From Swiss-Prot:
GO molecular function, one term: structural constituent of ribosome
InterPro entries named among the record's database cross-references: Rbsml_uS13_C, Ribosomal_uS13, Ribosomal_uS13-like_H2TH, Ribosomal_uS13_bac-type, Ribosomal_uS13_CS
Positions of the UniProt region annotated as Disordered: 97-127
Composition bias, Basic residues: 101-118
Protein's UniProt keywords contain Amino-acid biosynthesis: no
Lineage: Bacteria, Pseudomonadati, Planctomycetota, Planctomycetia, Pirellulales
Protein name: Small ribosomal subunit protein uS13
Organism the protein comes from: Rhodopirellula baltica (strain DSM 10527 / NCIMB 13988 / SH1)
Keywords: Ribonucleoprotein, Ribosomal protein, RNA-binding, rRNA-binding, tRNA-binding
Family the entry assigns: Belongs to the universal ribosomal protein uS13 family.
UniProt xrefs under HAMAP family: Ribosomal_uS13
Entry's Gene Ontology cellular component terms: cytosol; small ribosomal subunit
Function per UniProt: Located at the top of the head of the 30S subunit, it contacts several helices of the 16S rRNA. In the 70S ribosome it contacts the 23S rRNA (bridge B1a) and protein L5 of the 50S subunit (bridge B1b), connecting the 2 subunits; these bridges are implicated in subunit movement. Contacts the tRNAs in the A and P-sites.
Domain of life of the organism encoding this protein: Bacteria
Entry keyword Transferase: no
């Protein structure tokens, strides 16, 4: 099982799908990496040599933001938005959806479990 950027890459899958286990690398970029290095994207990950693994790692380090550095950049961007108190930063701060979704109903994942409010007493008496 090859290891790239601290992530175990599955042996039994094609290299193009194995590379998508890295954070920040989707199928398009995985194929792009294989094409740049002249590796057949449909070959199993178990068939690539240690030299190829080294070449892939070097290319990813040099040309792409993946794994730790990408996670760090995303976190820094969010904290910067919170710091300058932009609309998106405020939404992040109060744990509400950031991209314009409705919140009257739904948004439960972001808002957390429902906070139940007791009903009014005496409503039945009015009928």
């Amino acid at each position: 099982m090859p290891r790239l950027m601290g992530v175990d890459i599955p042996n039994d899958k094609q290299i193009q799908y194995s590379l998508t286990y890295l954070y920040g690398l989707g199928l398009y970029r995985a194929r792009e990496v294989c094409e740049k290095l002249g590796i057949d994207p449909t070959s199993p990950a178990s068939d690539i040599s240690d030299e190829d693994v080294g070449r892939i790692a070097a290319l990813l380090e040099r040309d792409y933001l993946v794994e730790g550095p990408l996670r760090r950049q995303v976190t820094q961007n969010i904290s910067r938005m919170r710091e300058i108190k932009s609309y998106r930063g405020i939404r992040h701060r109060v744990s509400l959806p950031v991209r314009g979704q409705r919140t009257k109903t739904n948004a439960r994942t972001r808002k957390g479990p429902r906070k139940t409010v007791a009903g009014k007493k005496g409503v039945k008496d009015l009928r």
